[in-house]
Amino acid sequence: MSGLDAEQLDELEDYVAESLEEPWDKGNGRPRELTLREALIAASGYARNNITEEIWAEIFDVDQSTISRYIAFLTPLIDKATTEFRPSAEEAAQATRGAIALVDGTLWPCWSWSGERELWAGKYKTTGHGSLIIANLSGRITYVSDPVPGNQHDMAKLKGSDCEIILKAAGGVFGDKGFIGTDYITTPVRKPQHRDLYMREHDYNNQVSSFRAPVERAVAQLKTWRILFTDYRRPLKTFLSSFRAAMGLYFFKESFA
């Protein structure tokens, strides 16, 4: 349910317990409705499955408000506990320097909150936040940028960012048509307005797509943490911490592979 096995849960529980200001189980007074492990299963499982708090409440036989309170409390702690597992820009630059890199933009969908028009992503025809993902040729993710409002296209996300620094140090970069206009990213040929693509251009585009396939698979693997794939429902102000917690859990789990 949590997306983590018993060993991984043990380690995460240790990390989170160390960051608590006071013990989860004080040994006196009214006991908590859930143990720390159970609460972590609910909070991690919410990121993994993005099922409603009401269903988690039924699973643990507690009130929905209890689940909501524990998710709100533990998500920032999971974010903090897994920080070291999320690749930094410096680590990504070192891993990418001189190597072939792949880059792709993606959207993390969310509800269409009133008054938040900048979340509308025309490319995807829905609302959300966008990030750039960098991977190597084997599909291992080396960097995920922090999310920005969905109305920013890939080139806007790239310009002046850590991703730009990382990719410019690579030995070569493949991206999709969203990166046409850069002089260091190999992209497909865009269809001219007044003619079809030549056969050689089709072949070239197919070659570029084959190189890009690993990063597309990597993005799909990231989105098995369903909070990144289906509409984010919690208050908008909580998204960044939830995003970082989900990313942290992904890389934390990968560290056991």
Task: Tell where the protein language model's regions lie, with residue ranges.
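Glycine-/proline-rich flexible loop or hinge segments
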Residues: 23-28, 50-57
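Short secondary-structure transition/capping motifs
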Residues: 1, 31-32, 45, 60-63
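A cross-family signal for key residues in well-ordered alpha-helices
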Residues: 13, 43-44, 159
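Charged, often Cys/His-bearing segments associated with DNA-binding zinc-finger transcription factors
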Residues: 1-30
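Ser/Thr-centered flexible coil motifs
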Residues: 5, 35, 198-200
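Short, amphipathic alpha-helical "recognition" segments used to contact nucleic acids or chromatin
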Residues: 35-50
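Short, well-ordered secondary-structure "scaffold" segments embedded in the functional core
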Residues: 52-257
